[in-house]
Amino acid sequence: MGLSIPLIPGVLATALAAQGIRKRSLSPSGGLAAFIVGYLMMAVPFRGFGVSLIVFYLTGSKVTKVGKQIKGSLEEGHDENGYRSGWQVLCNSISAFIASCLWAAMFSPESIHSYLFGSFLPPHLSWHRANFSMDMTCPLNPHIGGGWSRTLVLIALGHFACCLGDTMASELGILSKSPPRLITTLARVPPGTNGGLSTSGTLASLAGGVIMGLTMFTSLMVESAGCRTDTGKHLASTVLAGALGGLGGSALDSILGATIQKTDFSNSTNRIITDETKTKPREVGEVKTISGLDLLSNNQVNLLSSMATGLALGWLA
């Protein structure tokens, strides 16, 4: 039994990272993080993890460019290209990254993940290690590996559903013609306020979750003969899980954003001051706080909400 190091995932990860740097959707550190995360996720024998990452990255990058001029007029420091650092890449991938690496380490003995992480698995996970056959069984089978295969797949799905749902809600919801309402008080707030809700943003978060659910379902149907024996059941479970992850994750992100993430507004420019604002507040003009305590940054809120959503769906598995 030898080590298997797939080359195609390396080529794809390199191409996506290079494209991101070239188009300025990724910083150099973001490109490096995207390559590492992308390669290890796409190298998992069950390609649903890697495909979900690609769909999230490409869809999220496209969405950030929608209405870029309008968003630039509403937010200080807005980057129309979505220039993501290595930290931002990790915040938007870490839960799914860990889940995918654990899945490969547990169920693919010849994978690079098994060689890198297999010896570090805790006893209760090592006990369920097995050589998984996509032709014979479905990764969503609750009886495989003590249920860990299904749990890890749904953690990854929940993570990406939350992240894409929140991305679509924040990037498209800000374009709503009616002002959003703060999730905690329902007071009207300026577009771009952390924790602000709008009808278009809520629908966008649902759409993002459904997209990720359909992505995972399609991967399961293409790869696993075991999953094709019960198509309707798996379609319902993945789309429902994606929808819950998109809506629930975005709602959790909004609650955290409205309470423990500070939102400041410049009266002189009539724009929200974001984490990326380079001009100091005293240079921007008179600033007022709209909501939230200055405890977490936007990236930290995204990290917490995506982790919680992924773990919740995994627990419900």
Describe these PLM feature segments.
Residues 1-317:
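Hydrophobic alpha-helical transmembrane segments
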